[in-house]
């Protein structure tokens, strides 16, 4: 079976280089530095919002996926995330990958301009520091780093840069081989119940891996959460602080 993650990451490296040709890194970096200097405060903390919430729902804005095709091609970033906020979501995850998930960086900007105040997770396949500047530029509070995409050293460098840019990091893991990445002390650790190589989902991943994470870690269970019973079990058995739920 074709490994979808490898395909996506290979394309992402090409895509980033094309973006750099359109907007050189030095120019983007200056824009972000100026933006940070002019801001009244840092973006709202996603970690704090999740820990303060009784349920900790991260509602996801996603138009399509490689496994399901188009979910809602007409979903609008100006309205859907605001509806999530009104209905009690602690944070919003916005897919910004265009080729495979139908997303754009502008979706984050549009949601912010429409009045979204809760934290936004920039959900993409980050393999280059340039993408973290893109995330900060469009108004995200946190960025997703996927352990399977990065060496430990690469992840350490990107995490440090994210913090310099006032971005928190949700570090996503899928199997026990990636538990070493916890030593980097990310702001949040996510256990993805979906295998990103095959897109097969098994919620047992959260039960198995989350129990091996430090008690002090903010734990997020991602994908395959479709029933109240699963929600209750995750929060009770593995002390999951947050649940990432696809709702669009």
Residue ranges and their predicted role:
Residues 63, 67-75, 80-102, 181-210, ...:
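Glycine/Thr-rich beta-alpha phosphate-binding loop at enzyme active sites
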Residues 11, 62-64, 97, 125, ...:
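Active-site beta-loop-alpha junctions enriched in small/polar residues
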Residues 56-60, 91-93, 119-121, 141-144, ...:
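Structural preference for beta-strand elements that scaffold enzyme active sites
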Residues 40-55, 102-125, 147, 156-171, ...:
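Alpha-helix-loop-beta-strand connector modules within alpha/beta enzyme cores
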Residues 94, 134-154, 191-200, 238-248:
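Glycine-rich phosphate-binding active-site loops on the catalytic face of alpha/beta enzymes
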Residues 2-72:
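An N-cap/entry alpha-helix motif that binds or orients negatively charged groups
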Residues 127-139, 175-185, 221-245:
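Catalytic cores of alpha/beta
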Residues 58-78, 119-127, 170-172, 220-226:
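Active-site mouth loops of central-metabolism enzymes
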């Amino acid at each position: 079976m074709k490994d979808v993650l490898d395909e996506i990451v290979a394309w992402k490296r090409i895509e980033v280089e094309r973006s750099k040709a359109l907007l050189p890194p030095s120019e983007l970096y200056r824009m972000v530095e100026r933006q940070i200097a002019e801001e009244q405060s840092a973006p709202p903390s996603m970690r704090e919002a999740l820990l303060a919430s009784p349920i900790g729902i991260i509602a996801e804005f996603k138009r399509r996926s490689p496994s399901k095709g188009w979910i809602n091609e007409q979903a609008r970033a100006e309205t859907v995330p605001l509806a999530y906020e009104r209905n009690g979501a602690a944070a919003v995850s916005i897919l910004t990958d265009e080729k495979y998930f139908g997303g754009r960086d502008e979706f984050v900007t549009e949601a912010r301009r429409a009045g979204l105040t809760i934290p936004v997770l920039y959900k993409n396949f980050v393999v280059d520091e340039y993408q973290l500047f893109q995330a900060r530029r469009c108004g995200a509070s946190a960025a997703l780093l996927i352990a399977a995409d990065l060496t430990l050293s690469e992840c350490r460098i990107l995490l440090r840069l994210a913090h310099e840019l006032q971005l928190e990091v949700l570090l996503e893991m899928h199997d026990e081989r990636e538990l070493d990445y916890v030593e980097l002390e990310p702001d949040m650790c996510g256990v993805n119940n979906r295998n990103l190589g095959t897109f097969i989902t098994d919620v047992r991943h959260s039960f198995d891996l989350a129990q091996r994470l430090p008690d002090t870690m903010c734990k997020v269970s991602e994908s395959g959460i479709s029933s109240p019973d699963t929600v209750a079990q995750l929060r009770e058995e593995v002390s999951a602080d947050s649940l990432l739920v696809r709702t669009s």
